[in-house]
Amino acid sequence: LGDVYKRQGITKITATDIEYAKEMGCTIKLLGVAKDTPEGIEARVHPMLIDSNHPLATVNDSYNAVFLTGDAVQDTMFYGRGAGELPTASAVVGDIFDVVRNILWNCCGRIGCTCYRECPIKRVGEIKSKYFVRMQIENRYGTLASVASVFGNNKVSIAQMLQKRVNGKYAEIVVITDEVKERHFEDAMQILGGMSMIQEISSTIRVY
C-alpha cells in the first residue's frame, strides 16, 4: 500500500522544526487528508505545516476536528473531544447500542452503501504538495547553487531559500518549495542525500 496511501507519523518532528514553524507563522499538525481530484482520490496521513490562523491550527489537547471544503458550503469544520474518559466511554456505549440494535433487527447495519461511482486511488508519487526542507550543508562558495541546481533539474521549483545558522564548517539552510509532485521531490532528495557537500537532510515536512 506504500505507493497508494502515504502514512507518516510525528516521530521525526523536532523542537527545531517547531521553532522554525513558529517563526514562519505556522504550526505543525498531524493531518489526515482526503481529496477528490480528476486523477483519483488522494488519501494520506502525515505532519504538515499549517498557517497559525487556519482553524485546524487551534485544535489541541484531546480535541479532534474534521475540516471540509464543499462546492456550495465552502469551508466548514466539525470540532470536539476525541480522547479522554467520557468521550471514549460515549463512543464505546454508542457502538454497543448499535450492535444490540443490529442483533434485534437481524441486520448488519441500518444505512447501506451510498456509493454511486468507482474512483481510482491516486498514487503517492503523483500527489502534489509544497515542502519545507531543513538541511546542513558545507559553508563554502557554490554549495547553495549546487543545491538549487539539483532541485531545478528534478522539476522542483524553490519558493524560498534561507540560510539560518552557521556552525563552523556547516551552515543550516531552509528551503520552501512550490507545489511539486512527490516523485520529483523524492528524486531530488535522493540525489541531495548522496552529495558530499550535504552533511544531513534534517527534516522534510509538507506545507498545507
Go through each PLM region and give its residues.
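Catalytic, metal-anchored helix/loop core of enzyme active sites in primary metabolism
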Residues: 35, 41-138
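A conserved regulatory-domain signal marking ACT and ACT-like small-molecule sensing domains
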Residues: 96-208
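A short linear-motif detector with a strong N-terminal bias
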Residues: 7-9, 22-24, 44-48, 55-57, ...
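Short secondary-structure transition/capping segments
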Residues: 13-16, 21-23, 75-83, 149-158, ...
